């Protein structure tokens, strides 16, 4: 089970976008990376194809999972733990002890 999933609200802990928040768009567990909307935006040169024009586009690049933290209910970053509730493994916020999903 992953600690950070698609749709989670996260905050950046390090890097050029430190302190910025966004929603996880994609998680790549094998690479330990995630794509966060509005964070780590880079410019990419797009070659012209039959369907697309040539030009420079802005695109979100993946960030390492160690540089993001889930935002708790009070708006502060928290670590994630696991707990078994009713025979089901759920994610729990270490800061408040609340179940994140379930």
From Swiss-Prot:
Protein name (Swiss-Prot/TrEMBL): Large ribosomal subunit protein uL24
NCBIfam families reported in the protein's UniProt record: rplX_bact
Known role: One of two assembly initiator proteins, it binds directly to the 5'-end of the 23S rRNA, where it nucleates assembly of the 50S subunit. One of the proteins that surrounds the polypeptide exit tunnel on the outside of the subunit.
Gene3D superfamilies assigned to the protein according to its UniProt record, in alphabetical order: 2.30.30.30
Family indicated by similarity: Belongs to the universal ribosomal protein uL24 family.
InterPro entries assigned to the protein according to its UniProt record, in alphabetical order: KOW (IPR005824), Rib_uL2_dom2 (IPR014722), Ribosomal_uL24 (IPR003256), Ribosomal_uL24_KOW (IPR041988), Translation_prot_SH3-like_sf (IPR008991)
Subunit structure and binding partners: Part of the 50S ribosomal subunit.
Organism the protein comes from: Rhizobium johnstonii (strain DSM 114642 / LMG 32736 / 3841)
Keyword check for Ribosomal protein: yes
Pfam family, one: KOW
Example GO BP: translation
Entry keywords, A to Z: Ribonucleoprotein, Ribosomal protein, RNA-binding, rRNA-binding
């Amino acid at each position: 089970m992953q600690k950070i999933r698609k749709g989670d609200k996260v905050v950046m802990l390090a890097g050029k976008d430190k302190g910025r928040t966004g929603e996880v768009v994609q998680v790549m567990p094998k690479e330990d990376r995630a794509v966060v909307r509005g964070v780590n935006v880079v410019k990419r040169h797009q070659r012209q194809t039959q369907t697309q024009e040539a030009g420079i586009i802005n695109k979100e690049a993946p960030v390492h999972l160690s540089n993001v933290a889930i935002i708790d209910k009070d708006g502060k970053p928290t670590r994630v733990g696991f707990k078994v509730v009713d025979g089901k493994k759920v994610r729990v916020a270490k800061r408040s002890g609340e179940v994140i999903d379930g």
